[in-house]
Amino acid sequence: MSEEGSPMYSPFFGVMGAASAMVFSALGAAYGTAKSGVGISAMSVMRPELIMKCIIPVVMAGIIAIYGLVVAVLIAGKLDEAPTYTLYQGFVHMGAGLSVGLSGLAAGFAIGIVGDAGVRGTAQQPRLYVGMILILIFAEVLGLYGLIVAIFLYTKTSS
């Protein structure tokens, strides 16, 4: 055991924060991409000219993984060995990773479901496209909220 505020297991929590940021965000992005991709594939049989217009849900789902990557890289850059890496830093980094990771997971699920239904509906009624985009923006913002909170938490360990 090292100092009181810095036990030897304190970096474990930072590593778990970085891992959870990337893993959960990637899971959300993968689900959103897969679910939207299935909808685009089904829609393109009837209306192949709409493929490029309806690729937006897949792009938005991919952005969710970038949020997790940014936070994971930030946390990994601050990781250090136990005497210099405190338990406080480990817990804050874990909170930041869970914040962006779980919000990315939720956003990816929302983007996938909305994207799937939206592109299928757009194939039948093109006026639904604008509504789908608006709903996708609101789903994407869920992941952005997690990124903002994670960066805010991350900055608390800088001083």
UniProtKB/Swiss-Prot annotation:
NCBIfam families, per database record: V_ATP_synt_C
One Gene Ontology term, aspect cellular component: vacuolar membrane
Species: Nephrops norvegicus (Norway lobster)
Side Cytoplasmic, residues: 33-54, 115-132
Residues on Lumenal side: 1-11, 76-93, 154-159
UniProt family annotation: Belongs to the V-ATPase proteolipid subunit family.
Pfam short name (any one): ATP-synt_C
InterPro entries: ATPase_proteolipid_c-like_dom, ATPase_proteolipid_csu, ATPase_proteolipid_su_C_euk, F/V-ATP_Csub_sf
Alphabetical list of Gene3D superfamilies matching this protein: lithium bound rotor ring of v- atpase
Keyword Transmembrane helix: yes
Membrane topology value: Multi-pass membrane protein
Identification of the protein by name: V-type proton ATPase 16 kDa proteolipid subunit c
Keyword flag Protein transport: no
Keywords of the record: Hydrogen ion transport, Ion transport, Membrane, Transmembrane, Transmembrane helix, Transport, Vacuole
Function as written in the Swiss-Prot or TrEMBL entry: Proton-conducting pore forming subunit of the V0 complex of vacuolar(H+)-ATPase (V-ATPase), a multisubunit enzyme composed of a peripheral complex (V1) that hydrolyzes ATP and a membrane integral complex (V0) that translocates protons. V-ATPase is responsible for acidifying and maintaining the pH of intracellular compartments and in some cell types, is targeted to the plasma membrane, where it is responsible for acidifying the extracellular environment.
Subcellular location: Vacuole membrane
Site entry (Essential for proton translocation), positions: E140
